[in-house]
């Protein structure tokens, strides 16, 4: 081993079994790509061992300057497949934006920028993230300093480029992650406008798990002899086992509570089809005694950032969300995904279940379906060429629990993670009602989560486990009724990239990766 390798601060090796989605390679190593030593140091210190198939295919082609259209499964290392060549080609001595990475969501932008910083920490490269929902003036001031790699969402990038603040005229590389979403009718006009700010000889890299016809139309117009990579021999990840439970709508909460009590959940993500149902379900889960956060697109951006960081860092076990977090979000500790509301199309389903079983690991996806979902279930099975099985009475833990669970990347040992009250009785969330009360309730609401709340933050949130973090200086005035006072539960104003307030968040136990948050997956 080289001397420089011996001095690296390499994290503990992840010994969990990995599927062929990430192990079926040609045996190429990262050093075979002739990368800068400083970049290799960042790669190995992030815990990367060998390239995954998509990295093995894409990195050398990207380094050769070719346009790329790459299709690979969720959770197989696409982010590093474009971040590594971007960092390799950046010259830190040139004070210009040299790579733009465009992503469709704010959370994915934060995550991707963190991967860039982690892998490029020895390169002296400046990475900036810019998204909607943040202060435009702050972004303009930050761009007055040197920025080598810009990560952002379409609207904000176009705004900055149009004002002449983000100079892309000498940027040789334009990367689009989740390109199918970025080239949907909502975003395509913005992407086309952003392209006009690049030089004519720019390099374009498109990465996604699915590519509809809109992507081909864009490719034909803007890419020059693109190199096409398709590693989708099948659409779903091999490590994810899929089940469905046929449940009446009013019994879904009861079924969810049963799953919580029976499954060995490391971390879980529960999906709903509307923002209203996200908040209602999060409230119900917390009332059952389980730690739970929620996140959806209508939340204030600072709240979304805080929920995302805390869930990623292991502060909470369960997250209820809309399709906001279906794309690209990489949290390796998630081993269970539950579709409380069944998705309407195969693309959404594919991205949802891809939040578990990240980077070749194991996970399960459980779908709670009612009578009206049966046609969608059949249609999704046919389109994806996969089988969604009826849920058995007992689920084999070997399907979703790692043999060496202590090696799962997380800042908190599993024993210390908040688990909630596992022995709640059914009567606590299904109170007995007489016939008149039942009829009245049925007339008011036909779903399992109770009446729809008024607009705005819900009232009487039951403590800090609920996931609605009220920072100091709540923008609508006083925090909602029932919020803990300042200092209770550790609430502090968030910062965009973590927490700078003394004593928050709680520090992980000693001996776990020097107390640092989990490293990004490949």
UniProtKB/Swiss-Prot annotation:
Signal peptide: none annotated. ATP-dependent RNA helicase involved in mRNA turnover, and more specifically in mRNA decapping. Is involved in G1/S DNA-damage checkpoint recovery, probably through the regulation of the translational status of a subset of mRNAs. May also have a role in translation and mRNA nuclear export. This is ATP-dependent RNA helicase DHH1. Its main location: cytoplasm. Keywords: ATP-binding, Cytoplasm, Helicase, Hydrolase, mRNA processing, mRNA transport, Nucleotide-binding, RNA-binding, Translation regulation, Transport. CDD domains: DEADc_DDX6 (cd17940), SF2_C_DEAD (cd18787). GO terms for biological process: mRNA processing; mRNA transport; negative regulation of translation; P-body assembly; stress granule assembly. ATP binds at residues 72-79. Its EC number is 3.6.4.13. The lineage of its organism: Eukaryota, Fungi, Dikarya, Ascomycota, Saccharomycotina. Residues 59-229 form the Helicase ATP-binding domain. Gene3D superfamilies: P-loop containing nucleotide triphosphate hydrolases (3.40.50.300). Residues 1-20, 408-522 are annotated as: Disordered. The gene is DHH1. It catalyses: ATP + H2O = ADP + phosphate + H(+). GO terms for cellular component: cytoplasmic stress granule; P-body. The keyword ATP-binding applies. SUPFAM superfamilies: P-loop containing nucleoside triphosphate hydrolases. Belongs to the DEAD box helicase family. DDX6/DHH1 subfamily. It is found in: Cytoplasm, P-body. Residues 239-399 form the Helicase C-terminal domain. It comes from the Eukaryota. It comes from Yarrowia lipolytica (strain CLIB 122 / E 150).
């Amino acid at each position: 081993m080289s001397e420089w390798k011996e001095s690296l601060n390499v994290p503990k090796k992840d010994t969990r079994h990995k599927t062929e989605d990430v192990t079926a390679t040609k045996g190429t190593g990262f050093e075979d790509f002739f990368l800068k030593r400083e970049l290799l140091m960042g790669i190995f210190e992030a815990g990367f061992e060998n390239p995954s198939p998509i990295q093995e295919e894409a990195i050398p082609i990207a380094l050769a300057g070719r346009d790329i259209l790459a299709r690979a499964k969720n959770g197989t290392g696409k982010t590093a497949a474009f971040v590594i060549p971007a960092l390799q080609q950046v010259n830190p001595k040139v004070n210009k934006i040299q790579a733009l990475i465009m992503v469709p969501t704010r959370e994915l932008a934060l995550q991707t920028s963190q991967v860039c910083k982690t892998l490029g920490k020895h390169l002296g490269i400046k990475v900036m993230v810019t998204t909607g929902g943040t202060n435009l003036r702050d972004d303009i001031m930050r761009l007055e300093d040197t920025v080598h790699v810009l990560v952002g969402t379409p609207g904000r990038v176009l705004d900055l480029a149009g004002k002449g603040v983000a100079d892309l005229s000498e940027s040789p590389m334009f990367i689009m992650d989740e390109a199918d979403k970025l080239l949907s009718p909502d975003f395509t006009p913005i992407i086309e406008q952003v392209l006009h700010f690049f030089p004519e000889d720019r390099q374009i890299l498109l990465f996604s798990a699915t590519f509809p016809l809109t992507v081909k139309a864009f490719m034909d117009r803007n890419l020059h002899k693109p190199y096409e990579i398709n590693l989708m021999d099948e659409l779903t990840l091999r490590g994810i086992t899929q089940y469905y439970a046929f449940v009446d709508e009013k019994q879904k909460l009861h079924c969810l509570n049963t799953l919580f009590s029976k499954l060995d959940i490391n971390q879980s993500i529960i999906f709903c089809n509307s923002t209203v149902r996200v908040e209602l379900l999060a409230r119900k889960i917390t009332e059952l005694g389980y730690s739970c956060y929620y996140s959806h697109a209508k939340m204030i951006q600072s709240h979304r950032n805080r929920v995302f960081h805390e869930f990623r860092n292991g502060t909470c076990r369960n997250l209820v969300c809309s399709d906001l977090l279906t794309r690209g979000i990489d949290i390796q500790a998630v081993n269970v995904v539950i579709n409380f509301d069944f998705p309407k199309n195969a693309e959404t389903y594919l991205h949802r279940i891809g939040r578990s079983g990240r980077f070749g690991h194991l996970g399960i996806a459980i779908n709670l379906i009612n009578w009206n979902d049966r046609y969608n279930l059949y249609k999704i099975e046919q389109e994806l060429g996969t089988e969604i099985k009826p849920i058995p009475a007992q689920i084999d833990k070997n399907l979703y629990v790692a043999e060496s669970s202590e090696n799962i990347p997380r800042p908190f040992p599993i024993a210390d993670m908040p688990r909630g009250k596992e022995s709640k009785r059914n009567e606590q969330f299904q109170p007995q009602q007489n016939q008149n009360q039942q009829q009245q309730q049925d007339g008011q609401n036909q779903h399992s989560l109770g009446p729809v709340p008024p607009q705005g933050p819900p009232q009487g949130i039951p403590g800090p486990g609920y996931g609605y973090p009220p920072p100091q200086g709540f923008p609508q005035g006083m925090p909602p009724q029932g919020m803990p006072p300042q200092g209770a539960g550790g609430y502090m104003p968030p910062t965009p990239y973590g927490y700078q307030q003394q004593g928050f968040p709680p520090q992980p136990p000693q001996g776990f990766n020097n107390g640092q948050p989990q490293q990004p997956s490949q």
